[in-house]
Amino acid sequence: RDGYMDCPERERSPYLGDAANQISETFYSLDENSYEMTKKTILTLLGWVTTDNIIPLRSPSQTLNECPAQTLNFLTVVREYLLYTGDSQTVRKFYPLMINYLKLWEMGDDGCIVYRPGTFMWTDWGEGADDKLLQECWYYYALTSALDIADRLSIAGDTQFLEGRIQSIESGFDAKYKKAGGFSSGTSYDDRANALAVVCGLAGEEDYALVSQVLKMQEK
């Protein structure tokens, strides 16, 4: 089938979480013919986004479920698609969906986002995922990806929104999540969330030793 999935014997449409992970792999494991499947995945979403700007977990689908972490992950991959392919036409069509989706989040008094559970969390397999920290990092990563896309495509109308939220999260992140044992929204430390804090840029080089101790102690 010409779609991204992890269970081809029962899945008929692409799941955004699977698509995000697999698209990133296709850029260096397959030839340029694979770009067409990624393009199809991006453009299919244009016809399935809901009237309240929710991007569904899979499309086409009779059940328009939302999993925010997976959708935010997918938004970051749209930027990768632009960088690898130069297909500005496809990304320009999808860009408004990105902005409208990012506007679904409210900002708290602490400068960080107000957590949205979506239809279900489904952040990762197993137990112990720090869903709130992961969503914060994925949201920030999606913001910076959208800002880079806007810059590359010379779209200026959303700069204030994107830069404002980026700066807000940067100013409030450490106070909310940084603790003696690592980054956490509670009392336990998730290696995935700490690693993502580094990948998205919210954890700087001065935090690498702190994150390293989490990676050495936890294994999810």
Where are the regions that the model predicts?
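Active-site core of glycosidic bond-cleaving carbohydrate-active enzymes
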Residues: 14-220
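Active-site-proximal alpha-helical scaffold in enzymes
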Residues: 11
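Leucine-rich, amphipathic alpha-helical/linker segments
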Residues: 6-8
